[in-house]
UniProtKB/Swiss-Prot annotation:
Glycans are attached at N4. It is an enzyme of class 3 (hydrolase). GO terms for biological process: proteolysis. This is Pregnancy-associated glycoprotein 50I. Belongs to the peptidase A1 family.
């Protein structure tokens, strides 16, 4: 499984 977290 893969998860992506992007905070700008």
């Amino acid at each position: 499984s893969g998860s992506n977290l992007t905070t700008v």
